[in-house]
Amino acid sequence: METLRYRFDGRNGARTGLDHALVGVVASGNLEVLVERVPLGGAMEIEIVTAARGFGEIWQAVLDDFAARHSLQDVRISINDVGATPAVVSLRLEQAIDVLQGADA
């Protein structure tokens, strides 16, 4: 297992909604994403625990893109991955933010 950690400066607070959201299932080729509102001094932190080692650059690219679209303050995202593709990662992140902010996913 490999653990990757990222921190982004947030510019926007997440819209009102839930305190946390969990989407996805840890299974072959998938992942789960937990998003929580926590005091982080305005930052967004993302931690990934993955079975697929050596993909840090790909994770960085996917998360840079996500952070550019959702520059959220005081949000922690925890990802448990079992080899999901970048498209699935992006989908689950979008779903988690939608659920956190009160939209149906």
UniProtKB/Swiss-Prot annotation:
InterPro entries: Mal_deCO2ase/Cit_lyase_ACP, Malonate_deCO2ase_dsu. It comes from Xanthomonas campestris pv. campestris (strain ATCC 33913 / DSM 3586 / NCPPB 528 / LMG 568 / P 25). This is Malonate decarboxylase acyl carrier protein. Covalently binds the prosthetic group of malonate decarboxylase. It is found in: Cytoplasm. Transmembrane segments: none annotated. The gene is mdcC. It comes from the Bacteria. Pfam families: ACP.
